Amino acid sequence: MKQRLGIVIALFCLSPAIFAQQKAEKNAREDNASFTFTESQLNEDDDAAQSASAFVSSNNDVYLSNVGYLFSPMRFRVRGYNSQYSDTYINGVLFNDVETGRFSYGMIGGLNDATRNKEGIGAFEVNNFTFGPIGGATNINMRASQYAAGSKLSLSGCNRNYILRGMYTYSTGLLKNGWAFTGSLGYRWANEGVIEGTFYNAFSYFLAAEKVFNDKHSLSFATWGAPTERGQQGASTEEAYYLANSHYYNPNWGYQNGEKRNSRVVHSFEPSAIASWDFDINKEMKLKTSAGFKYSNYGTSALGWSGNAADPRPDYYKKLPSSIFNVYDKSTVPSEDELNLFNEVTERWKTSKSTRQIDWDQMYFANQQANALGKETLYYQEERHNDQLAFNFSSIFNHTIDQHNSYVVGLAVNTTKGMHYKKMKDLLGGDLYTDVDKFSVRDYGYNSYVIQNDLDNPNRRIGEGDKFGYDYNIF
């Protein structure tokens, strides 16, 4: 992640045909656009899985509009480009992640109605908010006066990451006193999704207010967020899928005191806000200025263990039958003991679900034994954070010279601070953990400085909630 400071000045002319049809096409988009977020956009960690269908379905191009609506569940990509080649703006301010180059759709998850007003463009198309990147761009309009007056309640169910979703949106429209207010709430939930061991718990909110002072000036403010907690599924090997007799096998969870517990849990919350000033200087000249803020808090948990502890992952290669001997190698002749062990491990994998999943109780027992001997905690659960603090500013001046010519001048300033660290989430019943590289200890011993994660605070004792391992900022 790095700080990006960009100043963009764009001067271009609109052809008579584009200019004459601009207003009509904008109205057609608002009336007929079908804007669809895929499940991958709202829920996946891997931003590379995000598709471009979010913007193409709001585009007035016949081809893009149709494929965006019809193929969005299939993660349609314009010309095969990944999502880092597409830009997403809110009130004219770029909100793409500086590190990945992609827009985080999780920040507006569950806010379908609040993000319905938008303008989409294809590659290098003429527009009033940005250069057209090769993957296209979308500008979401969150000004309160742009929402139709009224209320809407929707309930839906599915059998994917979550099973129930509720959304409520209310808008006053533009009142006689020049004020407009819009609010939206959403909730998505699943005790367990279609993948065993996963769960979903997400709340979302949106609040917007706007004051129209007169025909020339208006000020608007909007804030939104979607705090989310969800259990992840994990990829495994074809051998594990075969033994589990399911390609939905998920090695990330296990039983703890008879209850399912997922080791890979995502906690994400990206509270954001944007303020906009619209100044219609006259009929020919317009100035739109916006300033945005985003604080991204994203953490994903994972199991950790010392170099002297057995690997707790159930699908670790040494726990699979293939580690005993290679059944596909005809030159391999197993001994009777190897064959018996192979059959025994295969049978356990096929018949015992506990064999295929994480053994939480065993990890707690191992740590309790280490406590009794005054030794280091063997197993723990860490949370890896990739947080951001971002400020964005945009000012766009549009001048229509005559019926055939116009130009746009824009200024954009973006700055981001990235905060990367991990913290101790759960010691799993352990008492003692020292901030050193446990695998380096095996090679260099406890007396070597090489094992220290923090040379300024050597051998620092770590408790739950403390940062350890690494902690750095990138500006």
Model-based region annotation:
Residues 148-171, 413-475:
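Outer-membrane beta-barrel transmembrane domain signature of Gram-negative proteins
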Residues 218-276, 299-382, 445-460:
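Acidic/polar loop-and-plug regions of large Gram-negative outer-membrane beta-barrel proteins
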Residues 53-94, 123:
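Extracytoplasmic beta-strand/coil segments of soluble accessory domains associated
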Residues 149-153, 179-183, 219-221, 287-291, ...:
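Transmembrane beta-strands of outer-membrane beta-barrel proteins
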Residues 81, 259-302, 376-414, 419-420, ...:
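Outer-membrane beta-barrel transmembrane strands
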Residues 55, 64, 93-124, 141-143, ...:
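Short acidic/polar hinge/loop motifs at secondary-structure boundaries
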Residues 74, 134-136, 164-168, 203-207, ...:
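Hydrophobic, lipid-facing positions within transmembrane beta-strands of outer-membrane proteins
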Residues 157-190, 194-233, 265, 271-281:
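Transmembrane beta-barrel wall of Gram-negative outer-membrane proteins
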